[in-house]
Amino acid sequence: MVFFVVFMLFSILILRLGELQIVFGDDFKREIERTEDITVNNPVPRGKMFDRNGKIIVDNTPLNAITYTKYQTTTQKEMLKTAAQLAKLITKDTSKVPVRDKKDFWIMKHPDEAKAKITKKEWDLYNQKKLDDKQIYKLQIDRVTDEEVESIQGEDLETLAIYRDFNSGFALTPQIVKNKEVTPEEFAVVSENLENLPGVDTTTDWERMYAFGDTLKSILGDVTTSEAGIPKEQLEKYLAHDYSRNDRVGKSYLELKYEDVLHGQKAKVKNVTDKAGKILSTEVVSEGKRGKDLVLTIDMDLQQQVEKIIEEEMWSAKQKPGTALLDRAFVVLMNPHTGEVLSLAGKQIGKDSDGKTVMKDFAGGNITTSYNVGSAVKGATILTGYKTGAIKPGDYLVDEPLFFKGTPKPKKSWKTFGSINDLRALQVSSNVYMWKTVIAMGQGKYIPKGPLVIDTEKTFSTMRQSFSQFGLGTRTGVDLPNEMSGFPGSDNKPGLLLDFAIGQYDTYTPIQLAQYVSTIANGGNRVQPHIVKEIREPIMENNELGPIVEEIQPKVLNHLDMKDEWIKRVQEGFKMVMQVGDGTGVGTFKGVSYNPAGKTGTAQAFYDGPVKSQKNAEVMNLSLVSFAPFDNPEVAMAVVVPWAYQGNTGPSINMAIGKRVMDAYFDLKKSRPVGGTAEGVQQSGNADTTQNGQQSGQ
């Protein structure tokens, strides 16, 4: 009976095995032979940047690099073993290894000692499922002593640093282990031992190289490191566009603004793996292509000269009394017809890491900082007066001290000019002419020693709307991130409206001033400034330009809602400032050959810079706007020097910078075979003077 039962059981087993082999055999075979296709994106170098004349500004320097690719089946123990082997062959920076990682590593290296850190009572709770693995591990971490952490030194610490890199990415995605200061000896010895270092490879990486050093550096922007990868706040956006977490991306200015252009097309590699995750074959799906190149509107020869001029004039001014708070200056040069920015320069005096006083690049301040700029805006005040009917071209008003009820001191120009017309008011920078214009604009009337009664709310609105047509108090649209619009004053008192009319209330950025004077220079078109001139396909030859993908066209944001003859009249007034009689710019620009026009500016302001103890100290801001040549403007310029000096007199650094920059521009144009800073580019003028001992407002 027993034999029969055993026989039947074996028969059933044989039949079942036969069924599995015959009926399901193919299914099992397919399961065993099942493979998986995994496509990995490998990064490529970023696009380069050139100046308008084809000079390389930002390049990629090749670097020897050591990478690690984790397979799907790679265990923690295997990674640790490979890391230890690699640590014997290379040196690895360990300064960024956090204490927590050292504790984790100590526990991995000393499992028995780590286990002993848990009490018998705690193990009993664990066995009773009242403590879980996570809680036990936390207790172990908390009990690793400082001495045990400090015991991780030398090769062990380098092993940990390498292991951290191994473990930082996803399976089948190469991670940079070392790409800085890889010695030829390290590169060679690792290459020779690759068969003993599973997942490790030697390759070529890149880093950004700036051909002109710190020149324009703040505008060019920065790129994240492969270690930092994509910033957390932008992770979702970039992952949705096929980026990897450790990809290097632009994090400021041009590198950020044109990330989608500069990033390039990644190489795609298909890895075929078996069921266990072992790679069976690798196929290149697409080779990838370096990011597209940017050709900037900037002329780097001019940019270097402008920066040198700013530095020299600032150091010179700092030797004079009253300039303790002077720490920055800005210059913008742009083509008034196309909006191409030829130079965007800013410098700031500060301290380096050793506490030494140095001059730093602050070109970004042209779009991210704003100031009271003084009388440079009087062209907009006059044109707004025409538009509202407060004055007509040729109207005469008496420049005299103005006495208002409740105001002990009279309000006056830097000099009493008597009866003057609009052109003369611009030429000599009359404050009183502007004040009487804005009083009329507000339906008021000047009564000596009487109250100032005007509709301030409506007039502020009218003037700000009008000024915005020139680009004052509104973003210019420049192709850079983080542009600010300036700050409008928050109060509507009548006296503040008078300050507004002479540029001493609302604040404006240097690039807004450049757009404003360009609008006047070109006859009324507010043109959007731009830093990028062209986008080009990359080519492999040494720093040569490829075919044009896109050429940035001039963009007119708006046209002044004003008569052409009004604009021409203000242009004439600006010419008188620079070239006629006692114009406030004549002393500096008399006799120059490039036929400039412009407007000087001085503003009584309150300090709000980095020296906290001097907050709200009275200071003088200096500015200058200009264009040239007068008959056919090629270039527009804005100069802004905040907090230039304290007291009634000080160095006219705005004029010194402006004159030298204008001269440099035209000298550079003459020195070139075809003339001009580049094809079709023109130059810029400058204007704005401070007369010693005179009230601000010139």
Locations of regions flagged by a protein language model:
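Membrane-proximal periplasmic segments of bacterial cell-envelope enzymes
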Residues: 1-260, 268-280, 286, 438, ...
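Cysteine/selenocysteine-centered motifs that mediate thiol-based redox chemistry or coordinate metal-sulfur cofactors
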Residues: 5, 9, 92-103, 111-112, ...
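Solvent-exposed, acidic/flexible segments
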Residues: 42-43, 75-83, 179-187, 209-216, ...
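Short N-terminal helix-loop-first-beta-strand/juxtamembrane motif that initiates sensory/input modules
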Residues: 46-49, 197-201, 316-334
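Beta-lactam-recognizing serine transpeptidase/beta-lactamase-like catalytic domain environment
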Residues: 58-59, 64, 272-287, 298, ...
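Solvent-exposed, polar/charged alpha-helical surfaces in well-ordered, non-transmembrane soluble domains
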Residues: 77-88, 188, 192, 217, ...
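A conserved hydrophobic secondary-structure block that centers on an alpha-helix together
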Residues: 284-330
